[in-house]
Design a protein with these regions (language model features):
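Conserved beta-alpha structural segments and adjacent helices that either
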Residues: 1-542, 561-586, 593-594, 602-603, ...
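Major-groove DNA-contacting interfaces characterized by cationic-aromatic clusters
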Residues: 543-550, 554
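A short, hydrophobic C-terminal helix/tail in secreted or cell-surface proteins
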Residues: 619-623
């Protein structure tokens, strides 16, 4: 077979057995994920897509979900913990929830796509039967004791709260039990009549309003390790065998012995169980592994960062750590498992299939010119392909529609990809999170993303975290920080900035902010996560009380603040409601001129600036 063997991207070839790999020539733009989505719809097993890093995982999931909408399979991931190896704090509850859900459903999966990074694949996992053996099931009509379910929930790793807001929480109010199960999209409200379940309803955690009723719910464990009697005994026995320290002076050992779920226990997973599993133990035998790029190199770089951090932190006698092989899996061992599965390699191989895709020409608008979209207009006039414009959000779609309208282009709105394929409109527009489009010459189809029309401005917007703070306390530049300044981390509370430290992870030297908390505990925050840090706004900077890492102190403080904010928000809503009843002067905004004006701004706007501009233009265009 030659390099130029061409195949239909809507029906790409799949490997027949584990002995003969299938090669796809590296496609352009979003074509890889389109091909995987199409292949997953008729494959006789799930597809495991292995990406080189977490950013690739996120983009792949978004594109796969778009192309797979209305198809008979699901797209999900086993997300990375998003912590450094041997970190002293735990992953976010939403990450743990997503991981537990993936591991629970994976063994019985007959069709779908699981996306994972090579670094996440190199972590040991709890035993295969752990999640199912520690799950609970609640059904309407089932007999239930409140005291018993409370005890079971706490043992499973759920936290008692007053109002359920995030995964792994539950609240008891009389005969009503609110639970936010791990792996669930929404929390549930369990209503008891005497000692039996009378109703089970989903509810909105923000409004606390009940939604649709269900007949049963599944409660997965709240963490990836057990803190029952057996789990604690295993931990204590292994700790005594591995470490020659004074256990009375080891807070980690004391916490686990008392059944306290202390942060960072994920990196001690190996001593809670007699045996661990890898992801391959969870995969069905019919799984097809798909990967691109040099995974071995990426895995070696990650292992180097693991061993480097291990050497740095192994000297801490008050928090001894496990050796790398107990926590992580070497890349050679990972890749040796590939031979047990069918495999798709995306590379320019002599026997690679060509998916027949082409890169789009440069369509970037030149807003400084009188006719900024000349390249796009030429493409439309010279070609007869059907074009699908892709905007990120409904608001961006309306803006793009106005822009295209000014140059005589009037696309038809389509709800999704399958709908576009079924229609024959020459120009269409949809909401799709595509980084890059593609050209399918054999199908006479072009996908044009916002990014390809506006350049990096859209990509930069996408990469900003949704949780970015909009207060004037946000730190936008490291020069604003001085050593020993009091700072606030959104998840861990008040600490002191102790400077920058360079740590090598995944083969890259990355700078971290060092924040010191009570009892000299240190937290390392990547510079890329600077938006999580803000200045302490209190008056007494010298005597500010520092929070303790790994306690609920900061969580309680945030909850009290949230309650006060809720009261203030109610007052503001009343004010805004009164303002809405009054009409003002409506301005008509020339979108083309406004975009031209905006593109002349020589700097990248801050989140505050963008938000202010958006509010102003929206208000001006409304009555």
């Amino acid at each position: 077979m030659s390099l130029q063997s061409k195949v239909n991207i809507f029906c790409p070839p799949l490997p027949v057995n584990s002995e003969d790999n299938c090669f796809w020539r590296k496609p352009t733009g979003c074509a890889r994920n389109l091909a995987i989505s199409n292949a997953a719809s008729y494959a006789d097993g799930p597809i495991l897509l292995i990406c080189k890093d977490n950013e690739s995982v996120e983009q792949s999931i978004q594109e796969l979900k778009y192309f797979s909408l209305n198809k008979n399979f699901r797209v999900f991931s086993l997300p990375d913990w998003e912590t450094l190896p041997y970190d002293i704090f735990s992953p976010h509850q939403d990450i743990i929830s997503e991981r537990l859900s993936a591991l629970y459903h994976l063994p019985e999966l007959d069709r779908g796509v699981l996306v994972i990074s090579i670094t996440s694949l190199m972590h040991w996992l709890p035993p295969l039967k752990y999640i199912s053996a520690n799950s609970l099931e609640l059904k309407i009509g089932q007999k239930l004791s409140i005291s018993q379910i409370r005890e079971q929930m706490i043992l499973a790793g759920y936290r008692t709260v007053e109002s359920v807001l995030e995964h792994g929480e539950f609240a008891v109010r009389g005969s009503i039990i609110d639970i936010y199960p791990m792996g669930s999209r929404l929390p549930f409200r369990v209503d008891l009549f005497d000692d039996r379940i009378d109703s089970l309803r989903m509810f909105d955690p923000e409004t606390q309003r009940s939604l649709e009723q269900v007949n049963e719910i599944k409660l997965l464990p709240g963490r990836e390790y057990p803190l029952d009697d057996m789990g604690i005994a295993n931990f204590r026995n292994a700790f005594h065998e591995l470490f020659d320290i004074d256990f009375r002076r080891c807070p980690l050992y004391q916490d686990v012995s008392a059944g306290i779920d202390t942060p960072g226990l994920e990196y001690y997973l190996g001593i809670f169980f007699d045996n661990l599993s890898s992801l391959f133990d969870f995969l069905p035998s019919t799984t097809i592994i798909c990967h691109e790029g040099d995974l071995h190199k990426a895995g070696e770089q990650f292992w180097e960062s693991i061993t480097s951090l291990y050497e740095d932190r192994r000297v801490d006698r008050y928090r001894p750590i496990l050796d790398p092989d107990t926590v992580f899996i070497r890349i050679d061992q990972i890749m040796s498992n590939f031979e047990n599965y069918r495999e798709i390699e995306i590379k320019d191989h002599t026997e690679a299939f060509d998916l027949e895709t082409m890169a789009l020409p440069d369509l970037t608008s030149k807003m400084q010119l009188k006719k900024p979209f000349t390249s796009l207009q030429k493409l439309i006039s010279k070609n007869h392909e059907r074009i699908l414009f892709c905007a990120e959000t409904a608001g961006r779609k309306e803006t793009l529609l106005e822009t295209l309208k000014h140059i005589g282009i009037k696309p038809t709105t389509v709800p999704h990809w399958e709908d576009f394929l079924e229609r024959d409109d020459p120009l269409s527009i949809t909401i799709a999170p595509l980084e890059q489009g593609l050209w399918l010459p054999t199908k006479d189809i072009l996908l044009v993303s916002e990014n390809q029309l506006y350049g990096n401005r859209v990509a930069q917007r996408r990469r900003r975290r949704k949780s970015q703070s909009n207060t004037d306390q946000i730190l936008t530049n490291l020069t604003e920080l001085r050593i020993n300044d009091a700072v606030v981390h959104v998840d861990h509370g008040v600490g002191r900035y102790r400077g920058l430290q360079t740590i090598t992870t995944e083969g890259q030297a990355i700078e971290f902010l060092t924040v010191e908390y009570a009892n000299t505990a240190k937290l390392y925050v990547p510079v890329a996560s600077l938006h999580l840090i803000s200045r302490y706004s209190g008056t007494d900077q010298e005597n500010v009380p520092l929070n303790h890492l790994g306690t609920t102190q900061w969580l309680k403080t945030k909850r009290k603040a949230a309650e006060k904010i809720h009261d203030v928000a109610a007052e503001l809503l009343e004010i805004y409601a009164r303002r809405q009843t009054k009409k003002g002067f409506k301005c008509k905004i020339d979108i083309e001129q406004y975009d031209k004006f905006s593109s002349s701004f020589p700097f990248e706007e801050t989140a505050d600036q963008q938000n202010t501009c958006l509010l102003y233009t929206s208000d001006a265009a409304d009555e």
